[in-house]
Amino acid sequence: MLVAVYKGNKYKFVLNKRRKGIITRCVQKTDGSFLKENDMYHKPVDEKDLSDIYMIEFYIFFDAGLKGVSSWWKITEADLLDNKVKLRFAEGILPGWNIEEKNVCTNEIDFNEISCAKVKFVFEKINGKEENVIKEETKSWNEILQNINEYSNL
C-alpha cells in the first residue's frame, strides 16, 4: 500500500494513469478541496506538496517446512479471515496446499501459528526530502493486526 502524509495526516496515495493524489474514507481529514466519489474522498496532489511518501508491507513468519520456501509471507488486509491468515504461494504448487490457479496455491493458518511478524517501510520521501530508505520493524502479531487495521482505514 502506498501512503502519503499531507498536512500531518496519513492518506492512501494513488499514482496511476487514471488519477494521482490522496484518498481517504475519513471525512474529518478532508476539506472543501476534496472530491467525493461514493464513500471515498479524493484530492489531486502534486508529490512536492507531500511531506512523506512510502510503501508499507506486512509480513508474518510461518515455516511451511519445505526446502526453498521462504518463511516470511507478505500479507494484506484481504488475507485476514476469521482468526486465520491466508498465505499465497505463486511459484508452484506446494504439497497439501489448495490450488488457486496455475502455479498458485494457498493455505490458511491459525493466528496462534504465527510466531513473529514485521512491517516494512520503503520510503521515497521523508520530511519533505527525497530519500530511498528501507526500514523494517519486528512486532508482535497483535501489533501487526493493529497496524493493518490502521492503514486499511486511512
Outline where the language-model segments fall.
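Short, surface-exposed polybasic-aromatic patches that bind anionic ligands, especially phosphate groups
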Residues: 1-154
